[in-house]
From Swiss-Prot:
Processing after translation: Not glycosylated.
Active site residues according to the UniProt entry: N307, H338
Protein's UniProt name: Membrane-bound ghrelin O-acyltransferase MBOAT4
Lumenal side: 1-5, 57-59, 102-120, 228-240, 339-340, 398-407
A Pfam entry, by short name: MBOAT
One Gene Ontology cellular component annotation held by this UniProt entry: endoplasmic reticulum membrane
Transmembrane segments: 6-26, 41-56, 60-76, 83-101, 121-136, 207-227, 241-261, 325-338, 341-357, 377-397, 408-428
Membrane topology reported for the UniProt record: Multi-pass membrane protein
Enzyme superclass (EC): transferase
Function: Catalyzes ghrelin acylation at 'Ser-3' using preferentially octanoyl-CoA, hexanoyl-CoA and decanoyl-CoA as acyl-CoA donors leading to ghrelin activity. In vitro uses also acyl-CoA donors of different lengths from short-chain (C2) to long-chain fatty acids (C16) knowing that acyl-CoA donors from butanoyl-CoA (C4) to dodecanoyl-CoA (C12) are more efficient compared to longer acyl-CoA donors, such as myristoyl-CoA (C14) and palmitoyl-CoA (C16) that are not efficient.
A single MF term (Gene Ontology): acyltransferase activity, transferring groups other than amino-acyl groups
Amino acid sequence: MDWLQFFFLHPVSLYQGAAFPFALLFNYLCITESFPTRARYLFLLAGGGVLALAAMGPYALLIFIPALCAVAMISSLSPQEVHGLTFFFQMGWQTLCHLGLHYKEYYLCEPPPVRFYITLSSLMLLTQRVTSLSLDISEGKVEAAWRGTRSRSSLCEHLWDALPYISYLLFFPALLGGSLCSFQRFQACVQRPRSLYPSISFWALTWRGLQILGLECLKVALRRVVSAGAGLDDCQRLECIYIMWSTAGLFKLTYYSHWILDDSLLHAAGFGSEAGQRPGEERYVPDVDIWTLETTHRISLFARQWNRSTAQWLKRLVFQRSRRWPVLQTFAFSAWWHGLHPGQVFGFLCWSVMVKADYLIHTFANGCIRSWPLRLLYRSLTWAHTQIIIAYVMLAVEGRSFSSLCRLCCSYNSIFPVTYCLLLFLLARRKHKCN
């Protein structure tokens, strides 16, 4: 009963599981002939509203208000100015909510309600959809809802025109978790003809359920190992590495199981399947590729594959638009988006330095190491170093507080990121001399 109690009674998992029958019902209704497009939008929107109220209670207003404001700005602003204003409004709103969490945790020293944590997580996902949509409009990929030429349209027509946008921002399969779905893909899936709508693959859902079950069993076993060992305060040398690695493994298993559950909900509703996809339609990007994450010896590849849709969103929103220090700016924005806790700021900035060092180290090694035995040894050592550094970053980010960060930095584990920092300095200096 240990893993059942830990996973299925987790609030987000519980609400995601409760939404599953409605996702299957939506998929079934889309296959029938009597479910028009507007009814599909309304079903997804109503489901999102009910799920938000059930999961967040009164805090659901923190989701509804920015979603309605975003639709109002999208409907009234020109494509040239829509992204800048919606971005600053959405990030400003999210930052205020995170400051409320800081005030509760650090000033009042009170644990915030679980519903507030769920709301903040959903708000971060809403920020992804709002900024993705505003970017699509500013880049001309999506037709703007700007009504400058139709100012005499009735209120009812304005509301029907805004329905796809508000439905996209609040549709229930992605409200509490899941891979970022672009507005183009969302609209294509909702408007897909009955003949092209993918049927429910119970084998695919069963396989995902078995994956979740296996991950939860591993998590139970690993949690017992972690609870039986010493903490970072009492560990010594190699024991610190083992404690850090096992604790980070517990975090990773939790993320993997939740991402697979979120992916299953999107598939059940018909938003995650490639079946029935039209030519030119955007492909679905799942958040997790466990094999790549656990076998890669490149920190930079891990960064691109960890929570893949979010990594692609950050690349588009920040990295590709930055003229100087794009890696640093991307990770700094990620720390802002996550809430600017001390551990998060340190963790993401440390990660950015590790990615930069990773590029230089592997570029240098690829030019020097020729024989396959040395390459095998090099790959093994860099794989171990990558896993340890990722574990270090993960403990910093998940620990969040300044006291947890101090314990981590004062432990024996800090020797590994310091080693990469020294290699970065030496290789950057060598590269500068060669140039």
